Amino acid sequence: MANEIILVAETGSDIPKDLAQKLGIILIPMHVLMGDQTLDDGTFPPEDVCAYYDRTGKIPTTSGSTIYDFRSVYDQIFEKNPDAQILHLAYSAVTTCSYHSSELAIENKVYKNNVRLVDTKHVSVGQCAAVSAVAAWLKDNPNATLDEAALAAEKICKQTQMCFVPKNLDYLRAGGRCSNATALVGNLLQLHPCIEIIDGKLIACKKYRGHMGKLARTLLHDFDSKHALQRDHIYFIVTPYMDEAVRTALNDEAALMGFQKITWVKTGCVITCHGGPGAFGIVGTSSKEQA
């Protein structure tokens, strides 16, 4: 039997801690800067991000996992087991330094060849879904080599599709992560752009008008039409202060559309700094062939 492959991801993946523990996923902290304080993502509630903005008028900024964050974890793993194998399924490399930090962390290390890095080209729950799917693949393929696992992960990441709709555009504008920020108009007009994660970038696509609960059903159908989502599992993204009408609408519509398993995942502090309160999102697996 091949040596067990250990999965590593950043806390920005929003993988719930109990799920990470169950699947054996090690989470590396990303960071949130509020004033002169730098806090580890996952150590405080995302509602604090919103409270800070309400109190100061400033949106907290984020930073990726550092070389030290990765190296300290990698060193600890290989001290316990020099033959360990690690597959780092990284937060989108075009949005943060985490992937590069991981590369530098293994540079000149004797265990370098026992670590593989895959850019998931996803953030938040998109990354969560991809990492969870890779964990399931590894369970079904216990004798897979590290290279085989990395190839499988790349395919899974390509099939994974994510979008979200922010309620308040101020966070997304301030965060500077949206690649076509000029498309971010509409707060006063009740226009809400759908942000899709495309090749690792946050891209503002179709705009929806009206209240979040009303447009949730329409977005689900549009997203399914575009990606031909597989029916075995769909993820919905819940953020601080999201309207419960959104949850009801998506649960009801997903059931009618034949989705067998519905999982709600709450965003952590990193993506809350960019998407803000009241947002919601959808993550699914495309049944279309991916280039």
Positions of PLM-derived features:
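Glycine-rich phosphate- or other oxyanion-binding loops that anchor nucleotides, phosphorylated ligands
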Residues: T56-S101, A150, C157-T160
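Non-transmembrane, interaction-prone segments in cytosolic or luminal domains
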Residues: A51-D54, P60, K80, K214, ...
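Short beta-strand/turn micro-motifs composed of small residues
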Residues: A9, A90, V238
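Short beta-strand->loop
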Residues: A90-S92, V118-K121
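Intrinsic-disorder/low-complexity regions
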Residues: K80, K112-N113
